[in-house]
Swiss-Prot record:
Protein name: Chromosomal replication initiator protein DnaA
Function statement: Plays an essential role in the initiation and regulation of chromosomal replication. ATP-DnaA binds to the origin of replication (oriC) to initiate formation of the DNA replication initiation complex once per cell cycle. Binds the DnaA box (a 9 base pair repeat at the origin) and separates the double-stranded (ds)DNA. Forms a right-handed helical filament on oriC DNA; dsDNA binds to the exterior of the filament while single-stranded (ss)DNA is stabiized in the filament's interior.
Family: Belongs to the DnaA family.
Keywords of the record: ATP-binding, Cytoplasm, DNA replication, DNA-binding, Lipid-binding, Nucleotide-binding
Stretches for region Domain I, interacts with DnaA modulators: 1-74
GN (gene name): dnaA
SUPFAM superfamilies given in the database record: P-loop containing nucleoside triphosphate hydrolases, TrpR-like
Lineage: Bacteria, Pseudomonadati, Spirochaetota, Spirochaetia, Spirochaetales
Length: 464
């Protein structure tokens, strides 16, 4: 596409946005933009201020890029440049734009798909950094993207908060959408539920079924643990699953734990989810965390070459050593470092601990208590705090109690004698036995380690 073509479709994109927005919204956000230049697969747009650029890119950049793709058939990246005196209002397109429109009617540009997935543009395989702890899950995801509906169907990706489940799921969606003519639909479990309730109230359930049962070739649902204790939604998901599975459509779910542990999900849904492959994402190791930070710095410099940053290897290592909770915290720390560099021009290693004190575990007060662990474990296993600490010896209580003992030994500095007192006055030998039981099971049950990592993450979150 030539430069005029980019400008034409930019103006068409704004026209479409105007028709879909309120007048107040359009005048506040979109009337301040104007076309500056185009490059290969990129358009530079003028905005009135740096504050406006930050707010606008967070709220509307992906929406504009999707709309441009729908109209032109060409994917683009929007680049924003602050230009003082940006003209306001809906200015008429230049004469050369009208000429181009007459010769190249946008209506003649075929739409690539009948449905455009609402995917995060950064969640691709290219941006996913795979280490030893994610190698199997990464390989499975690539296999599904190359053979949707045939290998590993359904695919369930589970793990703790901020470990990359959504990224890996959406990377599959991006790849299938890019390389096939299949319709990819991505939705969070909560939005699936909200949409279903809305169609019930408006008596448009057929529209809902058409979208999820008949339009979808690939269905991605994030956070299916949301469906626990929601019988009506589970019923709808069950029939949607059956319809897609029988037609060999690809189904991908994410969850915060193995599906067998979703005790308030119907047994028939748990059974359906277990038909394919379940794979877990664990905490990234130190080397992987370093690689993730380096990759994100490279991506930032590629996206914003005019304000590229330099972060030394020493800073990268220091951050990676002190943030081992999840990738989301790494991203948050990097964002803060970038903001500091934009203001100060550079960053040195001696500044990092104070700058990132809320992220660094070593800088946080040690407030993890046995009581905190007991509450987290009780909530996770859906049992009462008093039962967990009490004298009950049925299996549904003893096993979570042993897990709580194991976590307490790892996350606190109490002796086994002190832990025995915390666990209702038990003997220290009971604590030792419980911890040894869990240590032994870790060797034979890989999913247990993922579950323990999830619980550790929840404990850390509870003291923030």
């Amino acid at each position: 596409m030539d430069a005029v073509g980019y400008e034409v479709f930019w103006n068409e994109t704004l026209s479409q946005i105007r028709s879909e927005s309120t007048e107040a919204e359009f005048n506040m956000w979109f009337a301040h933009l104007f076309f500056i230049a185009s490059f290969e697969n990129a358009i530079e747009i003028a905005v009135p201020s740096d504050f406006f650029r930050i707010q606008f890119s967070q709220k509307y950049q992906e929406k504009l890029e999707r709309k441009f793709l729908e109209l032109s058939g060409h994917p683009i990246k929007l680049l924003f440049a602050v230009k003082k005196g940006t003209p306001h209002g809906n200015t008429a397109p230049p004469k050369h734009v009208h000429t181009y429109l007459e010769k190249n009617s946008p209506a003649e540009v075929p739409s690539k798909k009948s449905f455009h997935p609402d995917l995060n543009r950064d969640y691709t395989f290219e941006n996913f950094v795979s280490g030893e702890e994610t190698k199997f899950s990464h390989s499975a995801a690539i296999s599904v993207s190359k053979n949707p509906g045939t290998s590993y169907n359904p695919l369930l990706i589970y793990g703790g908060v901020g470990l990359g489940k959504t990224h890996l799921m959406q990377a599959i969606g991006h790849e299938i959408y890019k390389t096939t003519d299949l319709n990819v639909i991505y939705v969070t479990a909560e939005n699936f539920g909200n949409e279903f309730i809305s169609t019930l109230l408006n008596k448009k359930t057929q529209d809902f079924k058409k979208k999820y049962r008949y339009t979808a070739d690939v269905l991605l649902i994030d956070d299916i643990h949301f469906f626990e204790n929601k019988d009506g939604l589970q019923e709808e998901l069950f029939y949607t699953f059956n319809e897609l599975f029988e037609k060999k459509k690809q189904i991908i779910f994410t969850c915060d734990r193995p599906v067998q542990e979703l005790k308030n999900l119907s047994s028939r849904l748990r059974s359906r989810c277990s038909r394919g492959l379940s794979t877990d994402l664990n905490m990234p190791c130190f080397e992987t965390r370093c690689a993730i930070l380096i990759k994100k710095i490279q991506n930032y410099n590629s996206t914003y070459p005019h304000k590229a940053i330099h972060i030394s290897d020493d800073v990268v290592r220091l951050v990676s050593e002190n943030i081992s909770s999840n990738i989301r915290d790494l991203e948050g720390a990097l964002t803060k470092i970038i903001a500091f560099i934009e203001v100060s021009g550079s960053i040195t290693i001696d500044i990092v601990p104070s700058l990132l004190k809320e992220f660094f575990l070593s800088a946080r007060p040690k407030h993890i208590t046995v009581e905190t662990i007991l509450h987290v474990v009780a909530d996770h296993f859906n049992i009462s705090y008093s039962d967990l600490k009490g004298k009950k010896r049925n299996k549904s209580v003893v096993y979570p109690r042993q897990i709580a003992m194991f976590l307490s030994k790892e996350l606190t500095e109490l002796s086994t004698t002190e832990l025995g007192i915390e666990f209702g006055g038990r003997d220290h030998s009971t604590v030792i036995y419980g911890c040894q039981k869990i240590e032994g099971e870790i060797l034979t049950n890989p999913s247990l380690q993922a579950n323990l990592d999830l619980l550790k993450s929840k404990v850390q979150d509870s003291i923030r």
